Amino acid sequence: MPRSPTSSEDEMAQSFSDYSVGSESDSSKEETIYDTIRATAEKPGGARTEESQGNTLVIRVVIHDLQQTKCIRFNPDATVWVAKQRILCTLTQSLKDVLNYGLFQPASNGRDGKFLDEERLLREYPQPVGEGVPSLEFRYKKRVYKQASLDEKQLAKLHTKTNLKKCMDHIQHRLVEKITKMLDRGLDPNFHDPETGETPLTLAAQLDDSVEVIKALKNGGAHLDFRAKDGMTALHKAARARNQVALKTLLELGASPDYKDSYGLTPLYHTAIVGGDPYCCELLLHEHATVCCKDENGWHEIHQACRYGHVQHLEHLLFYGADMSAQNASGNTALHICALYNQDSCARVLLFRGGNKELKNYNSQTPFQVAIIAGNFELAEYIKNHKETDIVPFREAPAYSNRRRRPPNTLAAPRVLLRSNSDNNLNASAPDWAVCSTATSHRSLSPQLLQQMPSKPEGAAKTIGSYVPGPRSRSPSLNRLGGAGEDGKRPQPLWHVGSPFALGANKDSLSAFEYPGPKRKLYSAVPGRLFVAVKPYQPQVDGEIPLHRGDRVKVLSIGEGGFWEGSARGHIGWFPAECVEEVQCKPRDSQAETRADRSKKLFRHYTVGSYDSFDTSSDCIIEEKTVVLQKKDNEGFGFVLRGAKADTPIEEFTPTPAFPALQYLESVDEGGVAWQAGLRTGDFLIEVNNENVVKVGHRQVVNMIRQGGNHLVLKVVTVTRNLDPDDTARKKAPPPPKRAPTTALTLRSKSMTSELEELVDKASVRKKKDKPEEIVPASKPSRAAENMAVEPRVATIKQRPSSRCFPAGSDMNSVYERQGIAVMTPTVPGSPKAPFLGIPRGTMRRQKSIDSRIFLSGITEEERQFLAPPMLKFTRSLSMPDTSEDIPPPPQSVPPSPPPPSPTTYNCPKSPTPRVYGTIKPAFNQNSAAKVSPATRSDTVATMMREKGMYFRRELDRYSLDSEDLYSRNAGPQANFRNKRGQMPENPYSEVGKIASKAVYVPAKPARRKGMLVKQSNVEDSPEKTCSIPIPTIIVKEPSTSSSGKSSQGSSMEIDPQAPEPPSQLRPDESLTVSSPFAAAIAGAVRDREKRLEARRNSPAFLSTDLGDEDVGLGPPAPRTRPSMFPEEGDFADEDSAEQLSSPMPSATPREPENHFVGGAEASAPGEAGRPLNSTSKAQGPESSPAVPSASSGTAGPGNYVHPLTGRLLDPSSPLALALSARDRAMKESQQGPKGEAPKADLNKPLYIDTKMRPSLDAGFPTVTRQNTRGPLRRQETENKYETDLGRDRKGDDKKNMLIDIMDTSQQKSAGLLMVHTVDATKLDNALQEEDEKAEVEMKPDSSPSEVPEGVSETEGALQISAAPEPTTVPGRTIVAVGSMEEAVILPFRIPPPPLASVDLDEDFIFTEPLPPPLEFANSFDIPDDRAASVPALSDLVKQKKSDTPQSPSLNSSQPTNSADSKKPASLSNCLPASFLPPPESFDAVADSGIEEVDSRSSSDHHLETTSTISTVSSISTLSSEGGENVDTCTVYADGQAFMVDKPPVPPKPKMKPIIHKSNALYQDALVEEDVDSFVIPPPAPPPPPGSAQPGMAKVLQPRTSKLWGDVTEIKSPILSGPKANVISELNSILQQMNREKLAKPGEGLDSPMGAKSASLAPRSPEIMSTISGTRSTTVTFTVRPGTSQPITLQSRPPDYESRTSGTRRAPSPVVSPTEMNKETLPAPLSAATASPSPALSDVFSLPSQPPSGDLFGLNPAGRSRSPSPSILQQPISNKPFTTKPVHLWTKPDVADWLESLNLGEHKEAFMDNEIDGSHLPNLQKEDLIDLGVTRVGHRMNIERALKQLLDR
C-alpha cells in the first residue's frame, strides 16, 4: 500500500472505518479502489513486469464492458491479482465494482471457461500456443455456468431483488437445502446485498456452523475471491470474524490465503488486528499465507499484532518468517510498537526471538526510548536489560500444508533464512532443513508428540518433514525432551497466551480440534510468561494433561491446532491454548507468578521490588491491634486512608507480611483521634467495623468508614521491617548502595537490585488494571510515544534517573549510560545543553510543590531545575485540554505501595506515566494526575503508570516530604515516617524507569520527567494517544497543599520533573526532546490535577478534608504524602512501595476524592477541619508518623529525627539526622554560617542533581547523593522534628518564623536549589544568623550543595537545602552533603530548590536553566522546628486560599503549631505564593507555579495552586531563604498561593544571579520558549530558581518578571530574629549584589526572569529583603499575619514598611487574603516592617503595585484556593503602570504588561492585535479567550482568576 506519512494508527483506524463503510457511494468507492489498486497492485505488477523483458507474456485483454481490447505485457511469474491491477491501471474509463472484475479464460480445447484465481501465478494458467497472442477476458465475475444453453430470461427472473434477498435470508438461517435449490435453478451467488453490501459467501463466512452453506455456495458458482462492497472477500470476513471453521473450509475449498481486500491487506493481516484465537492465524500461515503484507502506513502484521497485544499471533508470524525488523512509515519496528503501546508480552517475544532493540525509528528513537517516552518504564527496563544471550530463535521449521502449491512468496525452505534475523543459531545450511531426517525433526517434538506420531504417521511425519529443519532441530522443544534444552528459560515460556493450532498435514482435512492424533509442536514458547488456567480441561487423548481452574501453567511450546504443550501440577502435556490466560508477570525472569508478582500487579504505583525485599516474614514484624475511634461530628478520625482502588475486592491480592492489606493509613494526624488510639502511618487496615477489608478497594473501605458515622472500629496491622534501621540508613541512602553516587538511587537506600525488582514489580503491577489512576501514566504513554515520534529528543530519558541523591553530573551521566538513556548534554544544570535546563524554570516551581518530594528525591536539584520549566510548562499544559485525562497521571493519591520499601514507589506514580507518558501511560504524576483524573485514566494505563510511577514516586516520595504531604494532611507525620523510611532507589535506573513511567509525576527523576512521556504521538500514530500536549501530571503538585503543606509541596515537586517535559511539549523544538512526550503526559496529569483541584477548590470539604483527599485530588501532594507517609510508617520504610502499592490503587481515586482524611479531613468542615487536618498533618507529619521523629525530634531533639521525605526515624548518625540536628542547633544557635564552606565543595553539584541527569555532580554530589539518600529521610526527620518542633513552636512559638535556610543553593549552583530551613522564631534568629553565614559561605562555596543535598534529600535536593543550616552540626561536610542534607532535612516540606541555587549556580551551574527551586524547596517548606505546623500552614495556606480566611484561621487555630504553620507558610515564603513570586514572572514557570499551575489555577483549585505556589514559593523561598528568614512571611507564588515562610530561606541570590544569566540563556531557550510560549499563560507555573529565570522568559516575562519576581516585593518575614535576621540581611545584601549583578546583566533586570528571581530569592527574609531591597526592588514579600487568612503582600512598600511587614508577618496568619494582605500588610505589616531590618525592601520590591500583588497572592478567597491559582499569580507584583490603575482604565499596553505579569506574555500580541484594553477584560468569556489564542485551559483559568482578583480588589 502506498505509505503515507500519516500516523499508521490513524490510517489504520481510517482503513478499518472504510472497511465498514459499505454504503459509500459507488463512484467514490470505485475511485478509492482504483487508487488503492494503482498503489498496491501497480507497484508489484510494474516491478515484476519489467523484471525481464525476456520473461514476459503478452496477452490480449478483451474488456467487453468497455468494448475495448488491449494487448498488455504481463509477468507470468506475477499473480493474477497483479495482472489485474495492471489492467485496471490502463483503463481510461472506470468500471463499477472493479475489484470484482477478473481475468476470464474462455473455454477452449475442451476446458471450461474459468476466472483465474487472483492469487495464483499467471503462468499456472497455460495459454494456448500457436494461436497468436493469447487472449483473456476482463469481465465482472459472475457464475460460470456449465450448461451449454442458458435461458437468459429464466435467469433474469431468478435474480430479482426479492429472490436475492430470500437467498441471503436462507444463508442467514443456514437453510442449506433451500440455498442449494435456488443455486440449482441457476441463481448466481455472486451478488451484493443492497442493504449490507455483503455477498452470500461473505455472509456465510461470518456465520457459525456455515460449512455446508459455504460448500453449497461454492458448488453453486460462488467465487471465493468475490468481494463484498467493503472490498473484503469471504476469507477476510471469516478471519475478521475469527471464524476458524469457515476459514478452514474456504481454504480447503481452494481459497488463497493471500486474497487482498480493497486496501491490499490479506486475511492474515486482519487476524493480526482482530486477534482472538490465533488458530485462524495459524491456519492461514500453514496454508502458505504470505507474511509481511503492509498497509498504507507501512504497518506489517507484526506491527498490528504488537499494537493490540496479540502475542500468539505475533509469535506465529515470527515463526513463519515475519520480518522482525520491518519498519512502518514512521520507522517503527514491531518492538517500537510494543514499547509505545506497552505490550510487554509481545516485546518479550520479539526480544526473545531475536528482535533488534537497537533499531531506531525515523525519529532516531530506539524501542527503549520510545518506551520511556511512552512512560512504559517497566517495559523500557526490560528492553534495556535484555541481552543477546537471552535470545532463543526458533529452531523448528514452520509446517506448511502440502496440499497447496507453495506460493512463490511464502516461506518455504527460504523461510529459515528469513527467520535468520531472529535465529542467531541459524545455520547457513539451514535450507537443507527440508530434507532433514524425521528422526532429527523428531527432536523438536515433545515426547508426547513422538509417542503420538505413530497414531498419525502421515500427519506428523508429513508435517514434520516439511516443518522441522535439521539445524533447527536443536530447538527448545528439546527442553521438553531433554529437560532444559538449549534454553533453560524455554521450558517456562510463560507468556504464550494465544492458542497455536495443529498445523499438521491433517489439518488439511481436519480441524485442529478434530485432530485426535499426536499434537505437533510448532515452536518453543517464550519463557517468562505466566499462564493460569481459566477453564478446566480433561485430556481427550494421550499426551494431554488435565487443567483445573486457577492452575498455574508453564507453557513449554506452541503446538498446532491451538494446542500448547506445558506443565501443570507436575504433568507435562498438551492442552488447548484457550484454556489458559496469560497473567502479567512483571519480573523479567520467567518466574511463576508469585504473591509478589500479584501484588505488583495490584499496586502498580509501588515497586514490587521494594515490596519483595520485605517479602519474607522474617523481614517484617507484624503487630496487630484493634482500635475503637470515636470522633465528633465536625471532625475526622485524623487519618488519611490510602490503598488500591477497585470496585470489587481484588481477589488477586495476596496479603504478604510486608503488605498485608490493600488499604493502609497514608498519614495519621498527630494528636488526632486515630493518633491517640495508636494508629500510625503505614498501618494496614485488616478490618473496618469488624468487616475484613484486606482485599477491598479504597472507595468501598472509605464508604464503610463513613457508614460507621462517628464510631469506627479498626483492626490494623503495623508492619515493622527489621530493615527499619536500614531504612534510616536508607534514608541516608548510603552512597548509592550498589551504585555510584551517580545513581543517586541510593537515596532510596534500596539495593539497585531491589530497585530494579521494584521496577519490574511495578511494571507488573501497572500491568494490572487495578489502579487506573496509577496506570494513568500508562495511558498517557501512547501520547507520549507519539510525541516522541515527533520529537526524537523526547527519547531523552535522562529524566529516568530517579536517584534520590543528586550524584555528580558525571555520575548521573553514568547512570544514564547505565540506563541506556541518552544523556542530555547537560545533566549539569549549568550546562546550557542540559535538556532540562530550559525546562527548569517551570519545572522547578512545579517541582517545588508537587515534585518537590519526588523531584528532589529522585532528581538532582539541577535536574529538577532542568525539569522545572517543563514542569512549569506542563503546568501550563494543564491549561491544555484534558490531556491529563488522556494521560492519567499516576494517581497522586495512589496509596503508597504497601511496601514503602521503595520510596520511589511514591515518587513513581508514573506513570505513568506514563506513563509520562495506550493512552498516555506516562502520566507520571501518579499522585497528582491520578488524583486529578483517576477516573480519566484507563485502568490499565493508570495501573501501569501507577506501577511505574508509584515505584519511582515512592522512591521520590520517600525522599520528598511532599510525597508525604501529598498523601494527606496527616501526611506530615506520615511524611516524616515515610521520609524517615524513605529509601533512595538504589537503582536509579529502575527508579528512572519507574519514575519515567510516571514521568509527569516523576519528580525524583527529572531527567525522566514523565511529562516528556507525553504520548509519543510523534513516534506512533496511536490516535487515541494523540494528546501530545504535555499535561504535566505536575498537577499533582497541587495536592501538595493537601494533607500538609509538605504534602502539597511534594506533589508539586513530583510534578516538576515533569514540568520540564511540558516545555518541550510546548515547544517541540525545546531542548528537552523527551520532555515533549513526557510533557504531554505531564500536561495531562497536570490538567487532570487542575480539574481535580478545581473541583477541590469548588468544594470546601475538599479544601479541608480533601486536602488530604486532595492529596489524592491534587495528585502531587498525595504522592508526596503517600511516599512520605508510608515511609513514615517506620515499619514500612521499605514498604514505601507497599504503601504506594495499596495507596495507588485506592489512592488513585482516593487521592482526589478517595484519599479521605478519615481523620475528618473529608469529614471535617470543608475549610477549617480540612485545614486543621492539613496543618495537623503538616505538624503531625512527624508526629503522625508512627516513628515520627518530628514528634520525637521535637521531643527527643536532634537525636530523633524523622526523614523529611520518608517520615521514617532517621538514624541519629545518618547525614539527614545529623543535618536535622545540625539544623536544630543552627536554629538554636544562629552562628553556623561557616558551614557554608563545606557546602562550597558541593556547590559545584547541582542541588537537586538529577542523579541521572547530573554527571557533573559526582564530586560533591556523590556525597550529597548519599546524604540525600539519607537526606530525604533526614529531611523527613527534620521535618518530623520540625513538625514536632513545629508542634512545640506552634504551641509556644506560633509566630516563630520558619527560617527557610535556603543556603545558597546558588552556591551549589549546579544544584540550583536553595537550602530552606525553617526555624523557630528563636531558632530563627540563630538559624538566620547561621543561615546568613551559611548562606554567605554556601553561596560562595558548596553551601548550596549542602543545600542542594537538602533539596536532594527532600526530593533529592530539598534536604540539602535544610542541610545548609544543618551544617551547623557538621560545619563543612554537613553543609556539603550530609550536614547539608541533614540540615536540609530541616525542611519538613520539600523546599524546592529555589532559584537561589541558580544564583551560585552561575559558576558551576549556569542557570541558563534557572531551575525552579527543587521541588522539595519549591513545594516544601523548610520548617525545621515548625516544620509540621508550617507545612500544615502551607497546606492550610493553600486551603485558606481555597476557603479564604476560614482556612487561615483553621491554620492558625488548627494548630498552636499553626504559628508554626504560619511559619510553614513562611517556609512557603520559600515557596512564595505565585502571586508573590516575582520570579514567576521572571520565569513563566513561576507564574505557573506548578507545571500546570495555571491550569491548577484555571481549575481554580487554589489549593492546587498553593501547591504550585508552594513550589514557586519554594523557589523564591530558596532564593530568599538564604537572604533571610521571614518567619511568618507568607510567600505567594505567582500562581497565587500564599505561603507563610516562617523563615524565609536565606537568599543565596548571588549565586543565582550569575547562574541566572547563564540559566537565562538556557532557560530562555528551552524554558523561556517553552515557558513563555507554552506556559506563559499559566503564571502560576512554579518559578525556576530566581537565577533560573530564562532570558527568553525574561523577555516574555520581563514585565512580569519584574512584576512577579523582580518587582514583587520580597516576601520576607520581617520577624527575622536577631542573628538570623542579621544573617538574612547579610544574605540579602549579598543577594542584592547578586541580583544587581544579574540585573546589571542585560535583559536580566527586574524584568529579566533571573533578575526577578534573584530578587525573589533575596527577598526571602525581611533582612535579606532589606539587603536585597537595594539589590532588587522587584522581589515581593508579603507577611502573613497569623490571624489573617491571607498572606500579606508587600508590594513596593518602603523598606520600613517592608520591615514592619516582616515583623508583622511573623504574627500574621500564614495566609492572608489578598485584601487582608493589603490591609494588614500595609498597616500592621508596616509596623512589622520596622522590625524587619530591610527598609530597602520596597526598593528591592519596588513594585508599588505590590498591594495588588497581595491579591496576586490570590490569598483572597479565590486566590486562596488550594491550587496555585492563577488569580494569585495573576496579580503579580509588578512595577508596571497597570498595577496602579483600575482595570477599566488599563490601556492595551497595560493589558499586555498584565499578561506578562501572569507569565502569559505569549498572548500579548493577540490581545494587542485585537485591541483588548482594560474595559474589555471583565467581559472576556471563554470563547473570547480562545479566539484570542488562549487555548490552554490553564492559561484561561489564570487569566480569569487574575481578572477576578483584579475586579475583587
Swiss-Prot record:
<feature type="compositionally biased region" description="Pro residues">
    <location>
        <begin position="887"/>
        <end position="903"/>
    </location>
</feature>
<feature type="region of interest" description="Disordered">
    <location>
        <begin position="878"/>
        <end position="910"/>
    </location>
</feature>
<dbReference type="GO" id="GO:0043005">
    <property type="term" value="C:neuron projection"/>
</dbReference>
<keyword id="KW-1269">Autism</keyword>
<dbReference type="GO" id="GO:0035255">
    <property type="term" value="F:ionotropic glutamate receptor binding"/>
</dbReference>
<feature type="compositionally biased region" description="Pro residues">
    <location>
        <begin position="1577"/>
        <end position="1588"/>
    </location>
</feature>
<feature type="region of interest" description="Disordered">
    <location>
        <begin position="764"/>
        <end position="808"/>
    </location>
</feature>
<feature type="region of interest" description="Disordered">
    <location>
        <begin position="1678"/>
        <end position="1776"/>
    </location>
</feature>
<dbReference type="Pfam" id="PF16511">
    <property type="entry name" value="FERM_f0"/>
</dbReference>
<dbReference type="GO" id="GO:0030534">
    <property type="term" value="P:adult behavior"/>
</dbReference>
<dbReference type="GO" id="GO:0031526">
    <property type="term" value="C:brush border membrane"/>
</dbReference>
<feature type="compositionally biased region" description="Basic and acidic residues">
    <location>
        <begin position="1494"/>
        <end position="1505"/>
    </location>
</feature>
<keyword id="KW-1268">Autism spectrum disorder</keyword>
<feature type="compositionally biased region" description="Low complexity">
    <location>
        <begin position="1506"/>
        <end position="1522"/>
    </location>
</feature>
<feature type="modified residue" description="Phosphothreonine">
    <location>
        <position position="1278"/>
    </location>
</feature>
<feature type="repeat" description="ANK 4">
    <location>
        <begin position="297"/>
        <end position="326"/>
    </location>
</feature>
<dbReference type="GO" id="GO:0030426">
    <property type="term" value="C:growth cone"/>
</dbReference>
<keyword id="KW-0040">ANK repeat</keyword>
<keyword id="KW-0597">Phosphoprotein</keyword>
<feature type="compositionally biased region" description="Low complexity">
    <location>
        <begin position="1159"/>
        <end position="1170"/>
    </location>
</feature>
<feature type="compositionally biased region" description="Basic and acidic residues">
    <location>
        <begin position="1274"/>
        <end position="1293"/>
    </location>
</feature>
<comment type="similarity">
    <text>Belongs to the SHANK family.</text>
</comment>
<feature type="region of interest" description="Disordered">
    <location>
        <begin position="1432"/>
        <end position="1526"/>
    </location>
</feature>
<dbReference type="InterPro" id="IPR032425">
    <property type="entry name" value="FERM_f0"/>
</dbReference>
<feature type="modified residue" description="Phosphoserine">
    <location>
        <position position="831"/>
    </location>
</feature>
<feature type="modified residue" description="Phosphoserine">
    <location>
        <position position="1713"/>
    </location>
</feature>
<feature type="region of interest" description="Disordered">
    <location>
        <begin position="1328"/>
        <end position="1371"/>
    </location>
</feature>
<dbReference type="InterPro" id="IPR001452">
    <property type="entry name" value="SH3_domain"/>
</dbReference>
<feature type="compositionally biased region" description="Low complexity">
    <location>
        <begin position="1040"/>
        <end position="1052"/>
    </location>
</feature>
<dbReference type="Pfam" id="PF00536">
    <property type="entry name" value="SAM_1"/>
</dbReference>
<keyword id="KW-0472">Membrane</keyword>
<feature type="region of interest" description="Disordered">
    <location>
        <begin position="451"/>
        <end position="493"/>
    </location>
</feature>
<keyword id="KW-0729">SH3-binding</keyword>
<feature type="compositionally biased region" description="Low complexity">
    <location>
        <begin position="1721"/>
        <end position="1738"/>
    </location>
</feature>
<feature type="region of interest" description="Disordered">
    <location>
        <begin position="1574"/>
        <end position="1594"/>
    </location>
</feature>
<dbReference type="GO" id="GO:0007416">
    <property type="term" value="P:synapse assembly"/>
</dbReference>
<dbReference type="GO" id="GO:0035176">
    <property type="term" value="P:social behavior"/>
</dbReference>
<keyword id="KW-0963">Cytoplasm</keyword>
<dbReference type="GO" id="GO:0001750">
    <property type="term" value="C:photoreceptor outer segment"/>
</dbReference>
<dbReference type="InterPro" id="IPR036028">
    <property type="entry name" value="SH3-like_dom_sf"/>
</dbReference>
<feature type="modified residue" description="Phosphoserine">
    <location>
        <position position="1099"/>
    </location>
</feature>
<dbReference type="InterPro" id="IPR036770">
    <property type="entry name" value="Ankyrin_rpt-contain_sf"/>
</dbReference>
